[in-house]
């Protein structure tokens, strides 16, 4: 499996301006043990659903407003219950000499780590970072459905405290990121460009520990995805550049995003699509519109029926809550 271990196992110290990145193979035993101990302790608090305990280990500016993180802990704890916690990787990120921006506010920091004897690299790009010493700990919660618990940590008065929490599943529908990457390549060869584009998306979500990390391996994945994208997806799918699909009755459906989802834990992942609408409407009208949008999407791109369990449609109207509908492929006509 292509995990953070493969992405970064042979990283050595790299320099980007005033910031330095030291990986566990290059750091001192003292630093390595301290970072690993902090990461494990934080992961244990998450596993125990001990939000108060994790709050006590959090930097002051986040500890004082902990509600959002508490919710994430509560959602993650059941996913990692009973799992074995294993320290996968730790990094020492030193921004002690980082200067504030021209406006006096904390500057963005970029920590560049180069792979030994190659041009490959991994990047940590962290916005609005006060000068100081930071670390990043990746903890695997190994079980039937493994998760990766990653923590940005900052040294405060000699103690390592949490400055960011990034929980992510390592599998979807029973498969890991490398499986989806390999499957996407097979789909490209079979001219299934739509399925491949979405499988590449799932692969990246499973392989990347956190959005603030980029690597040459992930860049390679994205380049493959972009090269294989069907023309309608060459510029992505956004609110400014929606995917427009016509239904059998001539109605147009404007999709502002196209992605994947594993929340139902079926044997295949689901497609998710966000639909731009003017009004949500009453539930009966909204559901029919959503199911008609599903039908139009699959009629336009029938290959999507093969690679996925079903479709989620989220109809979004300005100032209103999204209206969601999910159907299995066999229920969409």
Predicted regions and their residues:
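Surface-exposed, charged secondary-structure patches
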Residues: 67-144, 174, 232-278
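Short beta-strand edge/turn micro-motifs at domain boundaries
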Residues: 106, 110, 129-174, 252-281, ...
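Short solvent-exposed beta->alpha transition segments
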Residues: 22-30, 36-40, 52-120, 204-234, ...
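Acidic, serine/threonine- and glycine-rich low-complexity intrinsically disordered segments
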Residues: 169-252
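Bacterial N-terminal signal peptides
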Residues: 5-15
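Short, low-complexity N-terminal intrinsically disordered segments enriched in polar/charged residues
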Residues: 18-48, 164-179
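N-terminal secretory signal peptides that target proteins for export/translocation
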Residues: 1-3
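Short helix-adjacent coil turns
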Residues: 42-54, 184, 190-194
């Amino acid at each position: 499996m292509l995990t953070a271990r493969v992405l970064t196992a042979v990283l050595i110290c790299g320099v980007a301006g005033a910031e330095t990145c030291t990986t566990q193979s290059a750091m001192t035993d003292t630093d390595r043990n301290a970072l690993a101990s902090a990461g494990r302790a934080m992961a244990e608090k998450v596993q125990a659903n001990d939000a108060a305990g994790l709050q006590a280990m959090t930097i002051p500016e986040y500890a004082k407003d902990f509600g959002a993180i508490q919710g994430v802990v509560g959602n993650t704890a059941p996913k990692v219950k009973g799992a074995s916690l294993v320290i996968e990787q730790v990094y020492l990120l030193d921004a002690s000499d980082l200067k504030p921006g021209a406006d006096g506010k904390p500057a963005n920091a970029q920590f560049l780590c180069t792979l030994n004897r190659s041009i490959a690299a991994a990047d940590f790009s962290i916005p609005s970072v006060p000068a100081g010493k930071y670390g990043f700990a990746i903890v695997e919660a190994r079980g039937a459905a493994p998760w990766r618990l990653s923590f940005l940590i900052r040294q405060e008065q000699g103690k390592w405290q949490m400055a960011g929490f990034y929980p992510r599943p390592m599998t979807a529908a029973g498969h890991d990121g490398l499986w989806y990457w390999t499957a996407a390549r097979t789909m490209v060869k079979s001219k299934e460009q739509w399925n491949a584009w979405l499988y590449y998306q799932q692969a990246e979500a499973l392989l990347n520990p956190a959005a603030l990390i980029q690597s040459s391996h992930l860049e390679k994945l994205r380049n493959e995805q972009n090269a294989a994208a069907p023309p309608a997806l060459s510029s992505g799918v956004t609110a400014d550049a929606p995917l427009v699909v016509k239904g059998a009755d001539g109605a147009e459906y404007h999709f502002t995003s196209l992605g994947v989802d594993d929340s139902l834990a079926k044997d295949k992942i689901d497609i998710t699509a966000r639909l731009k609408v003017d009004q949500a409407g009453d539930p009966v009208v909204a559901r029919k519109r959503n199911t008609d949008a599903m039908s139009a999407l699959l009629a336009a791109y029938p290959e999507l029926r093969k690679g996925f369990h079903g479709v989620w449609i989220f109809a979004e109207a300005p100032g209103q809550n999204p209206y969601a509908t999910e159907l299995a492929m066999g229920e969409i006509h």
